[in-house]
Structure formats: C-alpha cells, structure tokens
Curated annotation (Swiss-Prot):
This is FAST kinase domain-containing protein 4. It is found in: Mitochondrion matrix. Residues 561-619 form the RAP domain. Plays a role in processing of mitochondrial RNA precursors and in stabilization of a subset of mature mitochondrial RNA species, such as MT-CO1, MT-CO2, MT-CYB, MT-CO3, MT-ND3, MT-ND5 and MT-ATP8/6. May play a role in cell cycle progression. It comes from Homo sapiens. The gene is TBRG4.
Amino acid sequence: MAAHLVKRCTCLLREAARQAPAMAPVGRLRLAWVAHKTLTSSATSPISHLPGSLMEPVEKERASTPYIEKQVDHLIKKATRPEELLELLGGSHDLDSNQAAMVLIRLSHLLSEKPEDKGLLIQDAHFHQLLCLLNSQIASVWHGTLSKLLGSLYALGIPKASKELQSVEQEVRWRMRKLKYKHLAFLAESCATLSQEQHSQELLAELLTHLERRWTEIEDSHTLVTVMMKVGHLSEPLMNRLEDKCLELVEHFGPNELRKVLVMLAAQSRRSVPLLRAISYHLVQKPFSLTKDVLLDVAYAYGKLSFHQTQVSQRLATDLLSLMPSLTSGEVAHCAKSFALLKWLSLPLFEAFAQHVLNRAQDITLPHLCSVLLAFARLNFHPDQEDQFFSLVHEKLGSELPGLEPALQVDLVWALCVLQQAREAELQAVLHPEFHIQFLGGKSQKDQNTFQKLLHINATALLEYPEYSGPLLPASAVAPGPSALDRKVTPLQKELQETLKGLLGSADKGSLEVATQYGWVLDAEVLLDSDGEFLPVRDFVAPHLAQPTGSQSPPPGSKRLAFLRWEFPNFNSRSKDLLGRFVLARRHIVAAGFLIVDVPFYEWLELKSEWQKGAYLKDKMRKAVAEELAK
C-alpha cells in the first residue's frame, strides 16, 4: 500500500513539474500545496479527488487565453447602418453581454453622424431587447468594453431614469478599484462631455477622486499625456498630480508628446514654470527634429503662456525660417502672432514674413494680412521693403476696412499709427462719431481696451498730422476716467515716486501720476525755468491735460519734462528695444512738447542707495535739457 502511494505521488510530482512553466505563480503555489497535501493525507482520503484538484489551475489557464474573434464580432465591426446591427438580435446569432455592449457602442458611433435618428432608435423593439440583454448580464462585460459602453449610452440619449443606464453606472461604481487608470480617465471624460445630468456629475466626482488617488499607477508617457488632455482640466488637484508625474517622465517624451502637453497648458492658461523649464531643456538638448506642426504649436504655447526661454526661441526661429517656403499664409499669420505674443523679434524671420506677404499679394486673405500687421506693430518691426508692404496693406484695407468687426478696425488703424503708416481716411473712419460712440462708456475689458486705442489714434491725428481736419473725439471722451490711475503700484514705480518727492522737496514743484488726454500716464511732470530751477507746475497752462488747472503761460526758455519708467514687460524679449505700444507713447509725449526722462528698469536696478537714485535722475534731467539745447 505504501509503495503504491509513493509511486502515485511520484507520478503526480512529475505531472506538476511538466505543467509548472506554463502556469501563473498562483497556479504553481496551488499545485505545490496539492502535492504536499497528497503526501501528508491519511489513507482514508479518496485519491480519486486529486486529479480534479490538479486540473483546476489548468482550466483557469485555458480561461485566460486570448479571445478568439467570432463571426458576429466581425459583423458588428463592419456594420454601416443601425438596421444591420439590430438584425443580429433576431437572427441565428446568440449574442453574449460583451457583444451586446459592442453593438451599442457601434450604434453610438454610427448615429453620431445622424443624430436625428436617435429618437427612432430608442423606440425600436430590438433596441429595448438589446438593453434588456445587456442589463441581465452586465456583470460579465469586460472592463474596457464597460468604459466605452457608458459613454455610448450617454451619447445615444438614454433617459437618466432608465434602469439599464443606472445599472451600467452602478456597475462602474462597483468596479472602480479594479478598472485600469486609462479606463477611469475615459469614463471621466464621457461623464464630463456627454452628459450634464446630476447623477452623471456625481459619478464624475467619484471617478476624479479615484484618479487623484491612483495617479502613481501611471507608468508610460502616452497614458499620462492622454489623461492630461482629456480630464486634467476637470480637477485642479488631479492636474497638479499629473504635472508632478509629467516632470518624472518628461525625459521619455517624444516631440509630439511635448507638443501635446504644451498645447494643453496653453489651452488651460496653466503657466507651470517647473514643467515649462523641463520641457525647454529637452527641446534644446535632445537631437530630435521638429516638424512644422510641432514648431508652430510650440511657438503658440510659449507665446500664449508668456514663457521666455532664449534657446527655445532661437531654435524655433531658426527652424521655421528654413521651412518658410513650405508655409501657407495661414501658418505665417499664426507664426507671426505667436512670436509677437512671445515678444521675440527675429529680424530674418520677420523679413521672411514680409516677403511671403509680398510674394502672395494676390492670394493672401485680409484676416491673415491683419494678423501679420498686428504682429509687426506689437514688436515695432519695419520691413526693409516698407513702401511695398504698406502699399499692399492700404490697398487691401481700402474697400474692406468698413466691413470688418469694429474692434478689429480700431486695432488695425492703431497698428498703422504705431508704424507711422496711417492715412487720413483711415483715421477719419474710426474717429467718426457714429463709429466711436459704440465704445464710449464700455464696461467690458475689451471695450475699454478698444477705447484706449481710440485715444491713441486721436492723439496721433492731433499731434502727428498737422493737416488733419477732423473729426476728433469730443472733449468729454478724452478726459481721463477713474480707472486711468487705478493700477497696481510696481516696486520700480514706488521707488521712483519716493525719489522724486525727495528730489522736488515741495509738492507744488511737480506732479506725480499725470493722466494726459492722449491716453498715456506720465510718472511725473516738472517745469524748469531757463536756469534749471523748478517752477510750480500747476500754475501754468498745460495743454496735455483734458482739464487744465493753471492760467499762466510758461515763461520763455522754460522746459517741460516728463518722467517715464520702462518696466521689464515693456521691452522685446532679451532686448532694450521698446514694444510698439510704448514707442508710440514716447513719440506722442515728445510731440506734445515734453523732454523725456527715460527710467528703464535695467538702469534703475543698478542703483543701490537713495543718493545714487537722486543723482541718477538729476543727471538724466541735465542730459535731456542739454540734448534739446544742442538741437
């Protein structure tokens, strides 16, 4: 008996050794346990039960083999009409739960092109039969199919009170801990985009909570980028976690993934500096080539986020310059706008933009030309072929300017004023009372910005076009509003004001924060007599003010000085050249009879003591007067 038992166990162990390599770890442990139990079992244990126990892991292994596609699966995928799918229910095919779910998913896809047919589908008897079949076997639907199924039911417009929809939602809740991270993300996107019902929003909140808790499960860059694009914007805590994960995996990103992350950040206006720095490093250091689409999107994202990285900007400009012959007019306009937002003036690239416009003068559309013109004005760029370029601009605008959106008309004329290319007819078009009245008293930020540009256009006509006969903005419109001085005080502004107060000694010897009728605010204004002494500025006539306070004429030989501080954002990136807007401001103030005392941030930062700052301003004033006398 003992010998027979040992022989039997030897056979069992040999069988186990042969099956072990193909088994999962759990199966091997189970088999080892069975063998151990065989050796230690009593003689009364029925040996006949052992083969069944040993075969159990083998059966599980067979169950985990890849799914073999059946004919009905092929029919579902190839169906082009809803009727073909519904006929599968009444035919010889015996659909299981997964196939029923696949039919619903395919129906949703087909009806996305014909949304008017959804109502008829929901009333179809076969459709209700399909829902009942699915509802009865929902627990056996695969995870991936379940994640797509819920979105399809939302897209088909299944009523929220439907027990089938509620059953699927409840099944999702039960399986949340088992679902893969990408399935959770897909479900969250479906709840957010395809349904606005209260019950789906509650499910969305649960899904986002799970996504926030399980963010460490993300192991590859593709999943990470997909989740960031699809559901990152739905939850601030989730987005913070995804950005942390992005920093961890960014070295594995390819050009297209870097592009997607940047576009996503730009779309959400998320200026994540650590992530942008990491992406910039890899854009500069890695040898991969960037396609035209990637270059355009990267330039747009950096411009939209106002993130300045010199090496990235240089690479973008260089690579795009080499691709100029292949760019369309729309891409040139898009690219020019991006670099204008980025405040990066690459002279060869912008000359190429101007040449592209001239080469395609007959084909370029007005919107594209407008984008290029506005970009040139922002950066104060004057092309070498200036006459030809602006002749084309005036030719295109001549008949079409009145038909454009009013705010765009103002933007274009303002841009021409910045570049000193505006014509009298164009000034008259936007300064006409019937036109500008729509912007008077505007409450929105856009209307206020547009009216501010109208003030600048009005100042251009008044100061730079001596033969201009009108119309002009009314006196009531050019009077500075309460918001003209309602701005956050910068550190440079505060220090400059304190130094000026100490320099003047008395409040009547100068004015701080002077709002002019030209739409510009002076940091300070002083009046010097012929000996260089301060005069009480408020006692004298000031034509630059909408409501002058003084009545006396300035004495002969007196000089009116305006102090203008220039902050870091007022300049082109990595340059000491002012942006077009501030070039226009300086030009207007000079034309109004002022001597300019420029106070740029890069000079002020070098001054450490109050004495140095006071001496700096005195020296600037003397130089301004000396330059005027030298003329």
